[in-house]
Amino acid sequence: MEGLKDNLYIVRLKDEPNSLLKKFKSKDTYLNQFLERRAKRHQDELLAITYLLFLRKNDGDELVGYYTLSCSSVTATEYVRSKFHRNKQYEDYPAILIGRLAISKDYENKGFGSFLLRAIKYTVSEDQYIAGRFLILDAVKDSIDFYQKNDFDFWTKEDKDEPTRLMYFDLLQI
């Protein structure tokens, strides 16, 4: 991954041909189908924006991964409130939802997922097109360690037995 960083770039999904999107294969069939069949429609309906990660190659750029972002909010829990010692605490916080994040099978476990999370954190905190205190996501059980290694924490303890866990990253940490 180290030597490839200069050859990576992220673009917003626009008019990429369906054939390019169809070639993308992560280990999750649902995420593959979303990119191919629903990502453009979600953008048209203002539900989420999809960003594509490409690797510049001599024989043509390769789609390595993608993620989606949308606006959201989270209701503060006692668990989270205990972590923030402020005079004023809010019931609800604006948040930016990472709805989907996928990396191609060929590039899994090589740092590309962490690269995307760093890019998301930097972009939303620096560009500030919209305010959001937290990045949030619903992590499936087998991805929780990955998100914890990337500084995400659990929003609540109450969902520990659920198939997904709500996790967050506090953008004030940047």
Region locations from a protein language model:
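Short amphipathic alpha-helix that is part of the acyltransferase structural core
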Residues: E2-E45, D59
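Cytosolic beta-strand hydrophobic patch enriched in CBS
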Residues: T50-R56
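Conserved catalytic-core motifs of GNAT/GCN5-like acyltransferases
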Residues: I136, Q148-M167
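Conserved acetyl-CoA-binding loop-helix of GNAT-fold acetyltransferases
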Residues: N109-T123
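Conserved GNAT acetyl-CoA-binding A-motif
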Residues: L117, V124-A139
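Conserved acyl-donor/pantetheine-binding loop and adjacent beta-alpha core of acyl/acetyltransferases
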Residues: D59-R100, E108
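Residue-level recognition of the GNAT/N-acetyltransferase active site
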Residues: G99, S104, V140
